[in-house]
Amino acid sequence: MRDKYGVLDLGSNSFHLKIVEFKDQKIVNNFKHKEFVKFGLAVKNSGELKNKYRKKSIEALSRISKIIKKDPPNYLKVIGTNSLRNINDNNFLKDMENTLGSSIEVISSDQEGKLIYDGVINTTKILPKNYYILDIGGSSTEIISVKNSLINKILSFNIGSLTLNDKFFLTNGSIKDWYESIIYLSDVFSELHELRRDNIDLKKSENFFAFGTSGTVKAVIRSLDSFGYKTENTYSLEDLDYLAHVLINYENLYDKEKKLLKNTIDINRLNIMLSGLSILQTITIILEINTIAKANGALREGVLYNLFQNKNI
């Protein structure tokens, strides 16, 4: 009987539980459970928690704990990312651990970037030696620059689809909101201009490629496919621009596409999709990325492969 490996990712938009087995170094028998908690909105500027999200998070963890206890994995890792990095409430962290019955490891942005990279290279067929990995979370965005198949640089930005949505798109999202978000993001991601200059010699010799790992990237693929595109899990900046116009419903030209989206994309994702798309567009423009492909794994898969290979991170 094969060992079971589990990871619980306490993200800013949702809590993800994934339990798997391995066969021939590959993940099999994949079980997934998700709880939308919008945890990224829980933290005040002071690092304190809003009571509404405290209660919601504990209730979600209680449900997850019951699932784990029904069929516990042999190895389990619980990780917290940006939102938990920003919390200065140790009592709440202890409450979370007591509810789960497991310790929580709050990982650094560099650790997160390394695990995302591990998740991508262990699950995704990669042809280029030089590329970017883009991971748009709920409250942070990680960008990993890969040169000659090795990590060159990991950058983390304190903005994600959930927090940007709270800043610009709480009303349905107009073209004015969209433009203002792009201007704001151009400043947030200004550090990427230096990264692009570092890679300018590579840019001359090849089209620059990126792998996207987040819910935003998956939703873009599903959306374009629902419109009749044959994406084959890749898309360009022009495709992103088109999808942004659909989400805004520019000049009411996209009623048909909007209906398709409602039937294709989960409402929790759809509600923050324009903000995630704005982040993706801004990064793509600054880094002059030609093609974005969907990766088959990311942070959770990186944790699972580390557990499988080392029985620890």
Region roles according to the model:
Residues N74-N82, D110-L115, L134-S139:
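Short, glycine/charge-rich beta-strand/loop segments that flank catalytic centers
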Residues V37-F39, I136, I159:
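Hydrophobic residues in beta-strands and at strand termini
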Residues A42-K66, S83-K94, N98-N130, S145-K147, ...:
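Helical "lid/coupling" subdomains associated with nucleotide-phosphate turnover
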Residues M1-G6, L10-H16, V20-S83, N90-S102:
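N-terminal glycine/serine-rich phosphate-binding loop of ATP-dependent small-molecule kinases
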Residues M1-N29, V120, I126-F157, G215-A219:
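Gly/Thr-rich phosphate-binding beta-strand-loop-beta motif of the actin/hexokinase/Hsp70
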